[in-house]
Design a protein with these regions (language model features):
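Sec-dependent N-terminal signal peptides
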Residues: 3-13
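Short loop/turn motifs at secondary-structure junctions
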Residues: 2-3, 49
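Glycan-recognition and catalytic cores of secretory/periplasmic carbohydrate-active enzymes
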Residues: 17-322
Length: 322
């Protein structure tokens, strides 16, 4: 429960003029039955024969065999994250066991030992599908989401080892140390012989999946400084591109942060997430620039990408044409 209350305090402190009215914000415990129900559904997707959780399932929890029986990396990590949070809210030990199953499958089958980094997709039997495919920052970051949550809940040193192994792999292979273009590259070849591009995913998803959690868990200045660098990337490049767009910001970049104008889609959830991350970082490393940018990002969605009749933000826009 305390994590919900901490989140509400963060929101109220960052945007003090807002008075929550939702019953789920006023009493976060109301959300626990929903979390319990969601987690219970996904327990049925576990493969008790070969381990891991299927990726392609229908609304009833049946595997959609025609789509493939693959068990994608981020399915395992996100399932582990969800199960851990459900355990922390409900105390249901079975959810922690399910999270353990997901991570054990990842550790056994999704890590590329010869080259470092995580494979994108695994077949039912634990073999990597297309092991020489590109490795993306999106996958490398999200692989750490469930591991970090499990370590937070249990302090299991084995999971810490895998968490740091994954983090160091991204630092060694995806981080661009150039003072003029620092940031995470968006993708690399399977053996990391070539890396390229920058993106929203490579930048902002690093915060939510691992860097923020690592700083909260350790207080280590290594992760604090990384948060500052990623916040600078948001301010300089994502937020910095907003004034020249009809809506949203540039999401795809060349390696030197020049815009990739072959991709003009902007996603409202990404704009909101960037503001959310700046707000979270501001709670730990106060900077008025973070708050000002967060307010502008949220206002852009509310003013230009929000359904004021039925509620909720729209999803995708062309940033140039609106």
């Amino acid at each position: 429960m305390k994590y919900f209350y901490i989140f509400i305090l963060i929101i109220n402190a960052t945007f003090a003029q807002y008075v929550p009215r939702s019953p789920y914000l006023l009493d976060p415990s109301k959300a626990i039955p929903y979390v319990d129900s969601c987690a219970d559904f996904w327990t049925g997707v576990y493969d008790s024969t070969f381990g891991g959780f299927y990726t392609n399932v229908d609304r009833y929890g049946n595997v959609i065999v025609s789509w493939g029986t693959n068990k994608d990396l981020i399915t395992q990590s996100r399932d582990a994250y969800g199960f851990v949070r459900a355990y922390m809210l409900t105390g249901n030990q079975n959810y922690l066991t399910m999270a353990r199953h997901a991570l054990d499958f990842m550790y056994a089958h999704a890590w590329d030992s010869p080259h470092d980094g995580w494979y994108h997709s695994i077949d039912r039997f634990g073999n990597p599908i297309n092991p020489t495919d590109v490795k993306t920052a999106f996958d490398q970051h999200y692989a750490l989401l469930g591991i970090a949550a499990y370590y937070e809940a249990t302090r299991d040193t084995n999971d810490w080892t895998h968490l740091i192994q994954g983090y160091n792999s991204s630092e060694n292979h995806l981080w661009d140390n150039d003072p003029q273009s620092f940031g995470y590259f968006d993708n690399g070849t399977y053996d990391w012989s070539y890396v390229s591009d920058k993106s929203f995913n490579a930048t902002v998803d690093a915060i939510t999946t691992n860097v923020l959690e690592l700083y909260l868990l350790t207080g280590d200045n290594v992760y604090k400084n990384k948060l500052i660098q990623l916040a600078d990337n948001i301010l300089t490049h994502l937020y910095g591109s907003m004034s020249q767009q009809t809506i949203g910001f540039v999401e795809e970049y060349q390696s030197d942060w020049s815009w990739n104008n072959n991709e003009t889609m902007t996603i409202m959830g990404h704009v909101l997430k960037s503001g959310w991350c700046l707000g979270r970082i501001n709670q730990l490393i106060p900077d008025p620039a973070y708050v000002n940018a967060a307010e502008d990002l949220i206002a852009d969605v509310y003013n230009n990408g929000y359904d004021h009749e039925l509620g909720g933000p729209y999803k995708d826009f062309n940033r140039v044409t609106g």
